[in-house]
Amino acid sequence: MDKNPQKTKRVAVYIDGSNLYYKLKDLDIKNITYFWYGNLAKQLAGEGRTIVAKRYYIGSVRAKGGDKKAKKMQEGQVRLFNHLQSKSEGFNVQRGYLMKNDGTYHEKGVDVKIAVDLLVGAYENMYDTAILISSDTDLIPAIQKIKHLGKEIEYVGFSHKPSYGLIKNATETRLLTKNDIKEFENIEKEKKN
C-alpha cells in the first residue's frame, strides 16, 4: 500500500466569454460559437488534476422590438449557450447583461459574477487551483484574496495582448498563441453551417 498517496488537485475553470471572444477574433479563429471550450479547459488542467467546475460568463443580449442587430446577436448567443451546455462541453453558463448606449453594447455584471464565484469557491474549498481566462484587471482584488486563502490562481491570457496586472498577481501565467489554440477550432461544425 502506498504510504504517501498524492492527492489529485482540484481545478475550477472560469472563462470571461466576451474577453475570450475578442482575443480569438484577434487571432482570426473561425466559428467561435462552436470552439472546443471543454477541450481547451481539459488541456489547461493537464494530467493529474481533476476539473471540478467549468464556468463561462457572458453578457446576455435582450432583443427589444424591431432591433434586428440585437435579434441576430441573441440567436447567436442561444447557439453558443446550447453548445457550451452540451454534454461534450459541460459548462455552467453565468449571465450578466448587455446594455446598449449610443448604439454600442457594454457588458455589465460579468466581472462581479466572476469575482464572487472565484471567492466563494476559495472560501468553500471547492478547488485547489482556479484557472482564469480573462484579462480583466478588475479581478485583481479577488485574485489577491484567493492567494491569501492558500489557493492557486492561474491566469491564462494571450501573447498578443497580455494583462501585465494579472501576470503580476497570479500564481502562474500561461500566454497562449494562435498555434496553442488552433486545435480547438471546430472546423467540421463550420462546414455544416
Sequence positions of predicted segments:
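Domain-level signal for Mg2+-assisted phosphodiester chemistry and nucleotide/NA-binding surfaces
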Residues: M1-H106, E152
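Nuclease catalytic cores that cleave nucleic-acid phosphodiester bonds
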Residues: N82, S86-N193
